[in-house]
Amino acid sequence: MSNPAAVTAGRGSITHVIFDMDGLLLDTEKFYTEVQEIILARFNKKFDWSLKAKMMGRKAIEAARIFVEESGISDSLSAEDFLVERESMLQDLFPTSELMPGASRLIKHLHVKNIPICIATGTHTRHYDLKTQRHRELFSLMHHVVRGDDPEVKQGKPAPDGFLAAARRFKDGPVDSQKVLVFEDAPSGVLAAKNAGMNVVMVPDPRLDISHQDVADQIITSLVDFKPEEWGLPPFEDSN
């Protein structure tokens, strides 16, 4: 599913690409879901995707506040205590992170074609290192990485801070926002990219409410389905 008019408008103008990470390049969102389901089960509550959608892409403390308030457990568990409890479980899961389908192919393709690429993620440095430790060679192809604990990121998504910081750090930056293509899976991330004035391709989890998807310029079900030439980028040279 895509917006043909938006894709046509962006054709030929993209010079730089920014990737989100969790749920887009790495299959880590399942870890958050698993741990949060365990925590809520103690309070006889269930973790649903409407709540997850509100948390995705945000800074940890912001997501934690949403979690305890929206689930109705804030009187029993503070956002800070939730993060401490969640952290102990996630530490063991993050090093097992797997790449999402199509991620390696797209990153390597853009790198070989000399398209500057980077990451803008809400993940803090300590978690970034754990999540990427099995894939360091691939992630080393990024020109730079902007993380959630970066001093220039005053506000998390949907604020544009992370994406604007990422655009500034490219060689000869800042890059014109209209020439940047962002890949995101989270509703808050899509809004952040649009708030930064950038083009955005959304690769949502199929369980996300479709109402969250009308802001993106293009929607695809997997990075495998992305056609670079639709955005004026060099086409893939293989048929996989």
UniProtKB/Swiss-Prot annotation:
GO terms of biological process kind: dephosphorylation; glycerol biosynthetic process
InterPro entries per record: Gpp1/Gpp2-like, HAD-like_sf, HAD-SF_hydro_IA, HAD_sf, PGP-like_dom2
GO cellular component: cytosol; mitochondrion
GO molecular-function terms, A-Z: glycerol-1-phosphatase activity; glycerol-3-phosphatase activity; metal ion binding; sugar-phosphatase activity
Localization terms from the record: Cytoplasm
Pfam families listed in its UniProt record: Hydrolase (PF00702)
CDD domains given in the database record: HAD_AtGPP-like
Reactions catalysed: sn-glycerol 1-phosphate + H2O = glycerol + phosphate; sn-glycerol 3-phosphate + H2O = glycerol + phosphate
Keywords for this protein: Cytoplasm, Hydrolase, Magnesium, Metal-binding
Enzyme Commission numbers on file: 3.1.3.21
Domain of life of the organism encoding this protein: Eukaryota
Active site: D20 (nucleophile), D22 (proton donor)
Membership in a protein family: Belongs to the HAD-like hydrolase superfamily. DOG/GPP family.
Descriptive protein name: (DL)-glycerol-3-phosphatase 2
Origin species: Arabidopsis thaliana (Mouse-ear cress)
Lineage: Eukaryota, Viridiplantae, Streptophyta, Embryophyta, Tracheophyta
Name of the coding gene: GPP2
